[in-house]
Amino acid sequence: MITKKISCTVLGCTLAAALTLTACGGSGSGSSGSMSTGMGGSSSQTTQNAAWRTGLGILTEADGEERAGKINTIAAAVLLDAEGKVADVTLDEMELSLSADSTGKVTMPTDYRTKRQKGDDYPLAAVSSLKKGWTEQADAFGDFLTGKTPDEVKKLATDDDGKPKDADLLSGCTIAVDGYRDAVVRACENAKAVGSARGDRAVLGVSVRNDTKDLTADDDHDVTAQVDITVTALTLDADDRVTGAIADVTEPALTVSADGTVSAPELVKTKLEQGDQYGMRGASALDKEWYEHSEGWCDYLKGRTRAEVASIPDDGSDADLAAVCTISVTELQKAALAAFAEK
């Protein structure tokens, strides 16, 4: 569990967050969305959409010691209303562990599901005083935040173990929430107008790719064990059409030496957080940085249903998509579909 001493921060969605999360709170009707190539709405609707903002927050902690390493990523999708208050929250978390032996051989994890994706396979309910699983408690925390300002969320008190002090919150959530609180705060800080509106709900999707096969370090070469986590925050209207989207990728990597010692980076930035420093523009046919390709992809999703998102070709053959985004969208698409699955 990530505590308030998080050493590596990641904004995130392939943990596309990527790590995808179930919506909490804020339901209703009356939102509107249009396909990226469709007709625009009325001026009053445009004003409403601009007032409601969507945010994605990702925090990652990487840790290495002796012959073991851990990667922990928390993601939050947030919808803020016209007054800047939390209207909906979805949370998720991924915990990954790897090990190495004295010969430098690395053993990677075999299960890349998030806590929300694991469902009953994450056995919290059996040991919970509330007899509630992780998803129930995380959703209860999200519901508790509904109606609060980002500053009020930031000031939410926790004990030394990161667990909430508020009696009302404890009636539905007894897990440590300090990391979730901080991820929600980050999402609020990153929130922007992307087309979301009153009545929408926020969902989160995570997709993980591990291209690491057999890794063994030697005296001449350390090896890098990297996991690519794509996270996508979507807002959906009453018809389950996308009204807004934000997608990000975090790539935490652990280094393993010949004697099996695992070391971790002090800071992990997501691709969105790296901005122009990511360095893609010079190699892009569109002269765009990664975050601009991501924005193009997200705009392209607007107005689409799950089936329509699933039918988007990922081989670059869609001319309209290729005009705004030429990076691989395979993991972005997986994360978006994962978000639909958690609604």
Task: Label each PLM-derived region with a short phrase.
Residues 1-11:
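Bacterial N-terminal signal peptides that target proteins for export
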Residues 30-48:
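Low-complexity, Pro/Thr/Ser/Glu-rich flexible segments characteristic
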Residues 15-17:
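A composition-driven surface/loop motif
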Residues 19-23:
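C-terminal motif of bacterial Sec signal peptides marking the signal peptidase cleavage site
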Residues 46-343:
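Active-site- and interface-proximal helix/loop "cap" or "latch" segments in soluble metabolic
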Residues 25-28:
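Bacterial signal peptide processing site
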